[in-house]
Amino acid sequence: MGRRILLGSQLRRLRESRGITREAAGYSIRASESKISRMELGRVSFKARDVEDLLTLYGVADEAERDSLLGLAREAN
């Protein structure tokens, strides 16, 4: 569960630094605002596709950073 919390907090930091609402983030992955909240709190598992879509929305273009976060998502599940 520690990895879920770590990944969730990193996703929240990225979302907030870009000024994106939970609602907009949820819309981008076909989910609710509450699912984004649960993801950011580490309470649910992560789908690689959702993490990829969120990273794109949040403007994370650096391949090393993307790979690191996607690897963390795989390990968190």
What positions do the PLM features span?
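Basic, Lys/Arg-rich alpha-helical nucleic-acid-recognition elements, primarily the DNA-binding modules
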Residues: 1-72
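N-terminal low-complexity or simple alpha-helical regulatory segments
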Residues: 75-77
